[in-house]
Regions:
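Membrane-targeting alpha-helical segments
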Residues: 1-50
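Terminal membrane-proximal soluble interaction domains of membrane-associated proteins
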Residues: 64-140
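Flexible, solvent-exposed loop/hinge segments and secondary-structure transition points
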Residues: 37-74
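Transmembrane helix-loop junctions in multipass membrane proteins, especially transporters and channels
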Residues: 22, 26-27, 57-58, 136
Length: 140
């Protein structure tokens, strides 16, 4: 007969068995949690930035598009990266294309100050965490 105690026991036993069979299981779970927390933090910080931008518009704002060279390869990884960028206020994933033989994600930003810094922020923030979550902590 199903009960809450049986469910919790089965859940815990499942975690133990998985951790014994796959050594990287907990590291992968930690990488996924790291990505989710980073995404939530980015949404929060960017929301405040957009609120400030709307209430106190800066002079000489430069909206722009940056081309982010992709290390993510699978459709799932690319979709996750594009979705994370679009979920973050002030940025929007536009298109996936190629430039000089390299697959690129084109991203529109609300306030583009330094294109290189924006690309590094996306690659070091979102892309690196996605690769760790999908390919394992040793992927990068």
């Amino acid at each position: 007969e199903p009960s809450a105690g049986a469910f919790v026991t089965g859940l815990l036993l499942g975690f133990v068995v998985l951790s014994l069979l796959q050594r990287a299981y907990w590291r992968r779970i930690a990488a996924i949690a790291d990505f989710v927390l980073y995404l939530l933090w980015s949404i929060l910080v960017s929301s405040w930035g957009v609120i400030h931008y709307v209430l106190f518009p800066p002079k000489g704002v430069t909206r722009g598009i940056v081309a982010v060279p992709l290390e993510v390869q699978s459709r799932f990884e690319i979709a996750t990266l594009a979705s994370a960028i679009t979920l973050t206020p002030g940025t929007l994933s536009l298109e996936i294309g190629e430039s000089q033989g390299q697959r690129m994600l084109f991203v529109h930003t609300l306030n583009l100050i330094d294109p290189g810094a924006t690309v590094r922020e996306i690659k070091d923030g979102f892309e690196r965490r996605i690769l760790r979550a999908t390919r394992g902590p040793d992927a990068i």
